[in-house]
Amino acid sequence: MQYSEIMVRYGELSTKGKNRMRFINKLKRNIQAVLSVYPKVHVKADRDRTHVYLHGTDYQPVAESLKQIFGIQNFSPSYKIEKSVPALIEAVQSIMKEVYQEGMTFKITSKRSDHSFELDSRELNQTLGDAVFEAIPNVQVKMKAPDIELRVEIREEAAYISYETIRGAGGLPVGTSGKGMLMLSGGIDSPVAGYLALKRGVDIEAVHFASPPYTSPGALKKAQDLTRKLTKFGGNIQFIEVPFTEIQEEIKAKAPEAYLMTLTRRFMMRITDRIREERSAQVIINGESLGQVASQTIESMQAINAVTNTPVIRPVVTMDKLEIIDIAEKIDTFQISIQPFEDCCTIFAPDRPKTNPKIKNAEKYETYLDVEGLVERAVAGIMITEITPQAETDEVDELIEGLL
């Protein structure tokens, strides 16, 4: 038998009261976006669960995609069966013979939305249980935590049987907790920060600073590929490329070396905040981890944050590097992050950056620069690309080969 649909059950949505259907409809749209690569798949949502109809599509890749989508507690692949007692008996016996192993226990759980069906739920449980005993005489019933639970659902159009329950990603549907701008460098930390923000329902747009010719096309493609990895958790993501060459050259030429990193990050924060305002987002998200590098001390964060009143979320701020790497490997961004392309944070990095920069000193050195003009030109020059789960081309391997 071939699976006909996947029944999706909700996670934290059960606590959302009057907003429940808003959350469910957003989850439905996210599932549709992620599964858009499967044209035959159809998604239908109701208050208790979402149904993913396969229409002949291979179950396995669809299930792998569903495992990544936030807002799903668990899901079960189901067989569509003719709505008759003989057909249900035959299907139950066939499934049990396939999955049963010596010593396993079982349970039948029936549910009817079609109350005109010839048997009620109790009678159906008894009839199908007897059919299992007929097929496997030595099998034992266990009402709590059986090894195999056959779930039978009688609907208007057909009957459905499932026995597997696969854990989902949990969390909240992406887009139900507002919108944030993710400062995406190309390193290990910022994609993990983006993933954790997505898990709590924040819709993200990725802001990447590029400084050609100092940064290569490979660095840009790397950031786009990292963004693409994040799309599997909630659908398409807008990728915003910011031209940053002029700003970095100006800082390098006119500011003390010890403050290069502080001033660079203050400009990044200003520009991201300006883009956030124009694109109606509420927060900024970055991958700063306390004490990991010189620019990520509390004093540095304070000096950089001083240019904005917008909340800055730092999901990995208390994690050590190994914890962050564990998540990066889990979400399949680690191998991309370690590709040998420098980003704009490393090309002009001073040998001895200031670890306790003073806000008044940063403000003083910025008087040497046309801060407003530089920010305005950078924002005016942004390029926006919609990143989808499917890459149009994959040039990274070629770019790496060119470096070797």
UniProtKB/Swiss-Prot annotation:
Keyword Transport: no
Catalytic activity: [ThiI sulfur-carrier protein]-S-sulfanyl-L-cysteine + a uridine in tRNA + 2 reduced [2Fe-2S]-[ferredoxin] + ATP + H(+) = [ThiI sulfur-carrier protein]-L-cysteine + a 4-thiouridine in tRNA + 2 oxidized [2Fe-2S]-[ferredoxin] + AMP + diphosphate; [ThiS sulfur-carrier protein]-C-terminal Gly-Gly-AMP + S-sulfanyl-L-cysteinyl-[cysteine desulfurase] + AH2 = [ThiS sulfur-carrier protein]-C-terminal-Gly-aminoethanethioate + L-cysteinyl-[cysteine desulfurase] + A + AMP + 2 H(+)
Cross-referenced InterPro entries: Rossmann-like_a/b/a_fold (IPR014729), ThiI_AANH (IPR020536), ThiI_fer (IPR054173), ThiI_N (IPR049961), THUMP_dom (IPR004114), THUMP_ThiI (IPR049962), tRNA_STrfase (IPR003720), tRNA_sulfurtransferase_ThiI (IPR050102)
Protein's cellular compartments: Cytoplasm
Enzyme nomenclature, EC number: 2.8.1.4
Pathway(s) annotated for this protein in UniProt: Cofactor biosynthesis; thiamine diphosphate biosynthesis
Coarse class of the protein's main subcellular location: cytoplasm
Gene Ontology molecular-function annotations: ATP binding; CCA tRNA nucleotidyltransferase activity; tRNA binding; tRNA-uracil-4 sulfurtransferase activity
CDD domains, per database record: PPase_ThiI, THUMP_ThiI
Entry keyword set: ATP-binding, Cytoplasm, Nucleotide-binding, RNA-binding, Thiamine biosynthesis, Transferase, tRNA-binding
The keyword RNA-binding is annotated on this UniProt entry: yes
GO BP terms in the entry: thiamine biosynthetic process; thiamine diphosphate biosynthetic process; thiazole biosynthetic process; tRNA 4-thiouridine biosynthesis
Leading EC class: transferase
Binding positions (ATP): M183, L184, H208, F209, R265, G287, Q296
GO cellular component: cytosol
Superkingdom: Bacteria
NCBIfam families on file: tRNA uracil 4-sulfurtransferase ThiI
Protein purpose: Catalyzes the ATP-dependent transfer of a sulfur to tRNA to produce 4-thiouridine in position 8 of tRNAs, which functions as a near-UV photosensor. Also catalyzes the transfer of sulfur to the sulfur carrier protein ThiS, forming ThiS-thiocarboxylate. This is a step in the synthesis of thiazole, in the thiamine biosynthesis pathway. The sulfur is donated as persulfide by IscS.
Family classification: Belongs to the ThiI family.
Protein name: Probable tRNA sulfurtransferase
Taxonomic source organism: Streptococcus sanguinis (strain SK36)
Name of the gene this protein is made from: thiI
